[in-house]
Amino acid sequence: MVDISRELQVALNTGKVIIGFEETKKAVLAGTPKLVILAANAPKWARGDIEYYAKLAGVPVFIFPGSSIELGAAAKRPHKIMALAVLDPGQSEILKVVEHV
């Protein structure tokens, strides 16, 4: 099993990750992310938007098993993170989380 918190850190340090709902939504509409991660407590409207557009674009969505506060902590950020998009995983194996879903 992939340790999502550790792999997220590696992706943030060696790859390209977009943080924030609006930025993630724009990236999904452009079809550029390789993976979208949503906090488990994301509002239904936000989750519905991202999941709908991600399905159309063929982008996998992973629901982080924790709140937006915990996702922010996993990303070593001092704020909540509802959504993020992995554009380039770098040296991480974060894309393997979708294999276990």
UniProtKB/Swiss-Prot annotation:
Q: Which organism is it from?
A: Pyrobaculum neutrophilum (strain DSM 2338 / JCM 9278 / NBRC 100436 / V24Sta) (Thermoproteus neutrophilus)
Name of protein: Large ribosomal subunit protein eL30
Q: Which family does it belong to?
A: Belongs to the eukaryotic ribosomal protein eL30 family.
List the PROSITE patterns hit by this protein, alphabetically.
Answer: RIBOSOMAL_L30E_2
Query: Would you kindly state one Gene Ontology biological process term found in this protein's UniProt entry?
Result: translation
Q: Which domain of life is it from?
A: Archaea
Question: Which GO MF term does the entry hold, naming one?
Answer: structural constituent of ribosome
Q: Which UniProt keywords apply?
A: Ribonucleoprotein, Ribosomal protein
**InterPro entries registered for this protein in UniProt:** Ribosomal_eL30, Ribosomal_eL30-like, Ribosomal_eL30-like_sf, Ribosomal_eL30_CS, Ribosomal_eL8/eL30/eS12/Gad45
Indicate the secretion signal residues.
Answer: none
**GO CC annotations on file:** cytosolic large ribosomal subunit
